[in-house]
């Protein structure tokens, strides 16, 4: 959050499974649409928050499976853990707040008296969360009796049932809603209260997100029965909460447009990259647009036309240099020429490209340095390059690519880098 010196224009707080991530979309198209929109229009002045019921272990597994962006803040284990940035630094103030009237030993002891409760995997048992599976028909009765037992033992806990089978026991002060309220209070104290906040969810454990004052909310079209029921009983007359017509990340994009929170046209929704126009000079957008074109070129989804090559060359400095991850230097214009022979080589294959953490710095008047992680998925193999791009600009002439340098990220183990083009 340190990169922002003023209040974020927008803070998106989104659940992951079946909200940001559509597990019924093998190509991850809606997620990739959101990624392109966020990196080109929001990353530089907004905050992305993932709020998931997953433990850190399962969250990291999901990151390996899906093309998720790197969030600024991660809320895990149903609002009981808050971490910041790439390195996921824990919020110790939140940990202290959750210790009030909470005793993990007593919680486990009382829950063991209910044979209906089946303990979830060890990775899902956290310092402030105990998780079980329970049949839907028995959930209400078990929840009621458990609550009474905890009250008699002097504990102040909450029980959340979601997904038609998950039962989580947390401190009363925990949960996705309380974690969001805590974050908003913290940001306000720092003078960085977001101009707008959009909460996004699909299941019962997301309901609390929509109860926070002055927060917009979207239930994606595939929202579960328990969340729709909560909405009907508690928020049906609230114009700030909508039930989207689109699934998952598509519903989030729809909500951005519905509430007029900012741009809602993803670069992936524009069929011809030459038609993508931006009112102001935006180096981050140029990078997102180029790598989207690169993906479409190799998938054979754009015509093998001289117009595209000419357009690319016109945006590159005649002396522009590309430093390959192997350390080899070559001309940027030669790299564009080389790209021509790869047209359609990934047609019909699972080949996707996305940019993450796109951050542009205006170093001197007319010069920008853009840093990002460029990801490439080819079948089941994923590779990432830390990429630095230098742009220059002359008034009225747009941006010119001067220098591109790539190095393999820590997550990427490469035996042969000859197949990496740019």
Curated annotation (Swiss-Prot):
**Entry cofactors:** Mg(2+)
Q: What is its EC number?
A: 3.1.3.24
Any one Gene Ontology BP term? sucrose biosynthetic process
UniProt family annotation? Belongs to the sucrose phosphatase family.
Q: Which UniProt keywords apply?
A: Hydrolase, Magnesium
Which catalytic reaction applies to this protein?
Answer: sucrose 6(F)-phosphate + H2O = sucrose + phosphate
NCBIfam families documented for this protein: HAD-SF-IIB, SPP-subfamily, SPP_plant-cyano
Instruction: Name the CDD domains for this protein.
Output: HAD_SPP
Protein task? Catalyzes the final step of sucrose synthesis.
Task: Extract one GO molecular function annotation from the record.
Answer: magnesium ion binding
Task: State the gene name recorded for this protein.
Answer: SPP2
Q: What is this protein called?
A: Probable sucrose-phosphatase 2
Q: Which Pfam families match?
A: S6PP (PF05116), S6PP_C (PF08472)
Query: What does the subunit section of this Swiss-Prot or TrEMBL entry state?
Result: Homodimer.
């Amino acid at each position: 959050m340190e990169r922002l010196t003023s209040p974020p224009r927008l803070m998106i707080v989104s659940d992951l499974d079946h909200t940001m991530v559509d597990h019924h979309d093998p190509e991850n198209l809606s997620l990739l649409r959101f990624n392109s929109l966020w990196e080109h229009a929001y990353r530089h002045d907004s905050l992305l928050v993932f709020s998931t019921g997953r433990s850190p272990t399962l969250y990291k597994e999901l990151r390996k499976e899906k093309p998720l962006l790197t969030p600024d803040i991660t809320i895990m284990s149903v609002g009981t853990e808050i971490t910041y940035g790439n390195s996921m630094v824990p919020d110790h103030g939140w940990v202290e707040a959750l210790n009030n009237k909470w005793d993990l030993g007593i919680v486990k002891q009382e829950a063991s008296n209910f044979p209906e409760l089946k303990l979830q995997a060890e990775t899902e048992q956290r310092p402030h969360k105990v998780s079980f599976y329970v049949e839907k028909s028995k959930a209400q009765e078990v929840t009621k009796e458990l609550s009474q037992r905890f009250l008699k033992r002097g504990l102040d806990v909450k029980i959340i049932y979601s997904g038609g089978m998950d039962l989580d026991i947390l401190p009363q002060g925990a949960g996705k809603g309380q974690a969001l309220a805590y974050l908003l209070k913290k940001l306000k104290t720092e003078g960085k209260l977001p101009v707008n906040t959009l909460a996004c969810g699909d299941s019962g454990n997301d309901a609390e997100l929509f109860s926070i004052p002055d927060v917009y909310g979207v239930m994606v079209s595939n929202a579960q029965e328990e969340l729709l029921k909560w909405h009907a009983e508690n928020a049906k007359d609230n114009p700030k909460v909508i039930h989207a017509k689109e699934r998952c990340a598509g519903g989030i994009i729809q909500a951005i447009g519905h509430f007029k929170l900012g741009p809602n046209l993803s670069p992936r929704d524009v069929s011809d990259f030459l038609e993508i126009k931006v009112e102001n000079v935006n180096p981050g957008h140029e990078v997102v647009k180029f790598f989207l074109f690169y993906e479409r070129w190799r998938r054979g989804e754009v015509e093998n036309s001289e117009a595209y090559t000419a357009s690319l060359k016109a945006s590159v400095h005649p002396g522009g240099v590309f430093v390959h991850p192997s350390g080899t230097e070559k001309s940027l214009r030669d790299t564009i020429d080389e790209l021509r022979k790869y047209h359609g080589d990934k047609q019909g294959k699972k080949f996707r490209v996305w940019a993450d953490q796109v951050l542009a710095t205006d170093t001197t008047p007319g010069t920008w340095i853009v840093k990002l992680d460029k990801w490439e998925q080819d079948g089941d193999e994923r590779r990432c390059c830390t990429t630095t791009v230098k742009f220059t600009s002359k008034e009225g002439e747009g941006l010119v690519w001067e220098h591109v340098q790539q190095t393999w990220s820590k997550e990427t183990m490469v035996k042969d880098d000859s197949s990496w083009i740019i």
